[in-house]
Design a protein with these regions (language model features):
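Charged docking surfaces used in two-component/phosphorelay signaling
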Residues: 20-28
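Active-site beta3 strand of CheY-like receiver
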Residues: 49-55
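Receiver (REC) domain active-site loop signature in two-component systems and cognate sites
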Residues: 60
């Protein structure tokens, strides 16, 4: 399993249980974690913090994962930040739209730490693994 020591991930999900489960898995593979309950909180954190990765639920209140992704890609300072979206059902049209907006990858809930690690290893290697 890949180790991601000294890398910081923002977890954006409106369900505290989902955030906790994702955080526990991320801590297990070496990430430090920050949390947001919605897309608006996530944007505020991203603008103030150096991050290596964002994992966001596609279906959140106030600003959903697609809207968050669109805002990240539109901002010159954030546009290269790797974004992995999470979802309960892998609807093809949703995945297609997210890829068009610049999603790096996605995970279908529930997922285990091995699947998370494998996905993030691929995403970090593809994007160069550098903090913004």
């Amino acid at each position: 399993m890949a180790k991601f020591d000294n890398q910081i991930c923002l977890i954006a999900d409106d369900y505290s249980t989902a955030r906790r489960l994702i955080k526990d898995s991320l801590l297990h593979i070496g990430f430090s974690c920050l949390e947001a309950e919605n897309g608006n909180q996530a944007i505020a954190i991203i603008q103030q913090t150096t991050l290596d990765l964002v994992i966001a639920d596609i279906n959140m209140p106030e600003k959903n994962g697609l809207e968050l992704l669109k805002d990240i890609r539109a901002d010159e300072n954030m546009k290269d930040l790797p974004v992995v979206l999470t979802m309960l059902e892998p609807f093809e049209d949703l995945i297609f739209d997210a890829k068009k907006l610049g999603m790096n990858d996605y995970l279908v809930k529930p997922f285990d730490v091995f699947t998370l690690s494998k996905t993030l290893d691929k995403v970090i290697k593809t994007t160069g693994g550098e903090s913004l």
